[in-house]
């Protein structure tokens, strides 16, 4: 009986701490979120539809004028 375990035969999931986080997965998810937020921010800044201030009324171009 020297090689037998006496831990009660519980399942391995019974001893898992519910507050244990896989920090590599959390870090990768955060980096993906930050990258997407950065790209969306650049698209908003570079887009002509979202202007900060400036003339709100667009000037129509008349093709008949020289």
Swiss-Prot record:
Belongs to the FXYD family. The gene is FXYD2. GO terms for biological process: cellular hyperosmotic salinity response; establishment or maintenance of transmembrane electrochemical gradient; intracellular potassium ion homeostasis; intracellular sodium ion homeostasis; negative regulation of cell population proliferation; positive regulation of sodium ion export across plasma membrane; potassium ion import across plasma membrane; proton transmembrane transport. This is Sodium/potassium-transporting ATPase subunit gamma. The keyword Transport applies. It is linked to Hypomagnesemia 2: A disorder due to primary renal wasting of magnesium. Plasma levels of other electrolytes are normal. The only abnormality found, in addition to low magnesium levels, is lowered renal excretion of calcium resulting in hypocalciuria. Expressed in the distal convoluted tubule in the kidney. Found on basolateral membranes of nephron epithelial cells. The keyword NADP does not apply. It comes from Homo sapiens (Human).
